[in-house]
C-alpha cells in the first residue's frame, strides 16, 4: 500500500485549518486515513503546527511520501533533519549521541530564531498601536481647537449682539429719565 502524508481540510469557510494525516494514495483528500499525526493552522502568524514527532519520523523512515506543504512543515519541525542524522548514524559517520547533540543544537537555534521573530512581531504591533494612538490624539486636538475657535466666535458674536442691544436699550431709558427732568 503506497502511503502519503498529507493535509486533511477542517474548519469553516474562509478559515481552513488542517489535520496532518497518513493516508492511502487512492483515498480522497478528506476521506479515509490511516493515522492522524498532527494539526496545522495557517491562520495564525506564524503558522501553528502541532505534530507527533515520533510518529512522523516513523512514517518518513517507512517511506511515506509527503505532499509539498507537508514536506515543508516536516522540514521546519526537524523530521527531515533527524532522518538525515539517523542516516549518518547508520552509515557510521558518527554515533547516535553525537547525532542527538547535533539535533538538539539545531532545534535550540531554530526555537531562538522563532522567539526572536515573535518578539519582533509583537514590538511592531505595539509600535503600530502607539503610532495610531498618537495620530488619534493629534486629530482629537485639532478637532478640539476647531470647536474652541467656533465657540469663541459664537461667544464674540453673542457679546457683540448684546453690546449692540444694550446701548439701544439704555438710550431710550436715558431719554425717559431726561424727559421727566424737563417737565
Curated annotation (Swiss-Prot):
Residues 162-183 have a biased composition (Low complexity). It holds the Pfam family Ribosomal_S16. Residues 149-183 are annotated as: Disordered. One of its GO terms (cellular component) is small ribosomal subunit. GO terms for biological process: translation. InterPro entries: Ribosomal_bS16 (IPR000307), Ribosomal_bS16_dom_sf (IPR023803). Belongs to the bacterial ribosomal protein bS16 family. PANTHER family: 30S RIBOSOMAL PROTEIN S16, SMALL RIBOSOMAL SUBUNIT PROTEIN BS16M. This is Small ribosomal subunit protein bS16. It comes from Phocaeicola vulgatus (strain ATCC 8482 / DSM 1447 / JCM 5826 / CCUG 4940 / NBRC 14291 / NCTC 11154) (Bacteroides vulgatus).
Amino acid at each position: 500500500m503506497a502511503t502519503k502524508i498529507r493535509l486533511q481540510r477542517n474548519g469553516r469557510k474562509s478559515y481552513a485549518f488542517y489535520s496532518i494525516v497518513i493516508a492511502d494514495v487512492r483515498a480522497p483528500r478528506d476521506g479515509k486515513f490511516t493515522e492522524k499525526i498532527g494539526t496545522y493552522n495557517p491562520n495564525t502568524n506564524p503558522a501553528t503546527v502541532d505534530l507527533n514527532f515520533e510518529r512522523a519520523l516513523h512514517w518518513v523512515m517507512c517511506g511515506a511520501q509527503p505532499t509539498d506543504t507537508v514536506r515543508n512543515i516536516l522540514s521546519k519541525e526537524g523530521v527531515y533533519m533527524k532522518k538525515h542524522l539517523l542516516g549518518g548514524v547508520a552509515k557510521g559517520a558518527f554515533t547516535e549521541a553525537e547525532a542527538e547533540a547535533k539535533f538538539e543544537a539545531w532545534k535550540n537555534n531554530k526555537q531562538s530564531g522563532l522567539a526572536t521573530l515573535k518578539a519582533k512581531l509583537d514590538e511592531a504591533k505595539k509600535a503600530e498601536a502607539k503610532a495610531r494612538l498618537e495620530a488619534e490624539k493629534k486629530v482629537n486636538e485639532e478637532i478640539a481647537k476647531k470647536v474652541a475657535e467656533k465657540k469663541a466666535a459664537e461667544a464674540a458674536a453673542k457679546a457683540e449682539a448684546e453690546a449692540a442691544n444694550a446701548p439701544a436699550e439704555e438710550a431710550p431709558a436715558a431719554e425717559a429719565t431726561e424727559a421727566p427732568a424737563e417737565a
